[in-house]
Each structure stands twice: as C-alpha cells, then as structure tokens.
C-alpha cells in the first residue's frame, strides 16, 4: 500500500481544513517545498497536493507552488483542485505532475471525464467525495442523488483505474476513517485501485486498509498534528 502525505495549498501556504470548511482552516507552514522535503526525509515516495483556491474558484493562484514541488523531484505527485478542462490537465502534466485528479467535473461533465480517461489513462484519477453515502460536489456544498458506490461503478465502466474516495464526515476530524466503506468498495467495484482519504489517524487503521487490499492512503491532519509519524507509517505499510 502506498502512502500519500497531503499538502493542501491556499494562498501558497500549507493548510488543513476541517470537513472542507474554508472558515475552519489551520495554517501549518509557509513553504510547501520545505514540507515536501520533510516528507521525503521520512521515506515518502508519493505526494497528494490539493489546490484549495482552484477548487473554490478555478484560479491558478497556487500554480507557482505546484510547479516548484514538481521541479523539486523525488516524489510521485498527484494534484487535484479546480481541474475542469483538458487544458489544465496538460498544463499540470507538462510541469512534471504525475497524475491529475478530476473532482466535481467528473459528476458535472461525465463525457469529458470519460474522454480524459481514454486519452491519459493512468495519469488521471477521480476524486469521489461522499456525504452520507451520496456524491458531493463543488466543495462539498451540493449533494447529488447518486450513491458513491454506483458512481464508482460508472467510472470503472468508463475506464477509470484509480479512485480517491473521501467520506466527508471523517475528513479532518481525527476520529478514524470509514473502514467498512473501503471494504465495500473493494468488494463491489473490483479492478479499481482505491485510495482511502479522510480521518485516518491510527496505525491500526493503516494495517486494516492494507489487509483489505486498499491501494493507497492519504494522510493529512494526523501528520501535521503529530498523531501519526510518517517514517513509522511508511515502514509499517511496506513490511
């Protein structure tokens, strides 16, 4: 199982939100590249980057920070937040970003998503965020009528091989992740590499996710608060 420590960017700073709420934001650092270097020193090989400004208003205000992270090297980097066009995908991939994450656009423009999956293959992942089991979009403010599991099946049929699934209720509150959900996804949507995201705050959870065949896990607030030690976690999932 791969571990993706997370860097969420707002105004070029490293921040964390609680349950996606921009009014409940904590700043953890001024220098994303320094943060990424710390992750590398702890043994990380992967990095999950979210452009929160892009997610909110579609701007590219963190483009310079993302370019610097890609240029720094040493990590497989996936980027999400505000990626709604092929032009933006091209822009990031040409920087050296390894994988782009499509979020709300996968719901609002499924045809574009299917085309991008066909064109770019494994360089595209889809982020599925669910509230009470239903797909949520636009910064989690709108909840659709489609169940997350059903949407994942549709994505798999369209050729999606990587889905980052977040249970919104768990995100940023450090009270554990929804293990039953990831077990269900693995059983009901075979052939997709699922990344668990939101609320992972113990080594026991990581081991359980690994045991059920989860492809990857994203670690955010648990690292920044010191609840989890990245070096130890990397060793744990690699053994």
Kindly label every feature range from the protein language model.
Residues 46-64, 104, 165-175:
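Glycine-rich, proline-tolerant flexible connector loops at the mouths of alpha/beta enzymes
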Residues 60-67, 141-150, 175-183:
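Charged helix-capping and loop-helix junction motifs
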Residues 53, 61-118:
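Glycine/small-residue-rich loop that forms an oxyanion/phosphate-binding "nest" at active or ligand-binding sites
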Residues 8, 39, 47, 92, ...:
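Conserved, mostly hydrophobic/aromatic
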Residues 11, 19-23, 90-93, 97-171:
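Conserved anion-binding
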Residues 83, 94-112, 167-170, 198-202, ...:
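Glycine-rich phosphate-binding active-site loops on the catalytic face of alpha/beta enzymes
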Residues 48-51, 78, 101-102, 125, ...:
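Conserved beta-strand positions in the central sheet of alpha/beta enzyme cores
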Residues 73, 77-98, 180-216:
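Catalytic cores of alpha/beta
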């Amino acid at each position: 199982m791969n571990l993706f420590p997370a860097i969420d960017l707002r105004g070029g700073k490293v921040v964390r939100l609680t349950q996606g709420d921009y009014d409940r934001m904590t700043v953890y650092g001024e220098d994303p590249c320094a943060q990424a270097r710390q992750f590398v020193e702890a043994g990380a090989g992967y990095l999950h980057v979210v452009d929160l400004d892009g997610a909110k208003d579609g701007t590219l205000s963190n483009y310079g920070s993302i370019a610097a992270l890609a240029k720094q090297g040493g990590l497989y980097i996936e980027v999400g937040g505000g990626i709604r066009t092929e032009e933006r995908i091209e822009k990031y991939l040409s920087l050296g970003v390894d994988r782009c994450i499509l979020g709300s656009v996968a719901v609002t423009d499924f045809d574009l998503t299917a085309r991008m999956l066909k064109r770019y293959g494994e360089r595209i992942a889809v982020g599925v965020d669910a509230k009470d089991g239903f797909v949520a979009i636009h910064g989690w403010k709108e909840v659709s009528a489609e169940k997350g599991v059903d949407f994942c099946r549709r994505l798999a049929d369209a050729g999606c091989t990587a889905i980052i699934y977040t249970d919104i209720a768990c995100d940023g509150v450090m009270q554990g992740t929804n293990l039953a959900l990831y077990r269900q996804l693995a059983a009901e949507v075979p052939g997709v590499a699922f990344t668990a995201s939101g609320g992972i705050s113990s080594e026991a959870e990581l081991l359980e996710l690994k045991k059920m065949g989860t492809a990857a896990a994203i670690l955010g607030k648990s690292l920044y608060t010191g609840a989890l030690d990245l070096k130890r976690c990397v060793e744990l999932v690699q053994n």
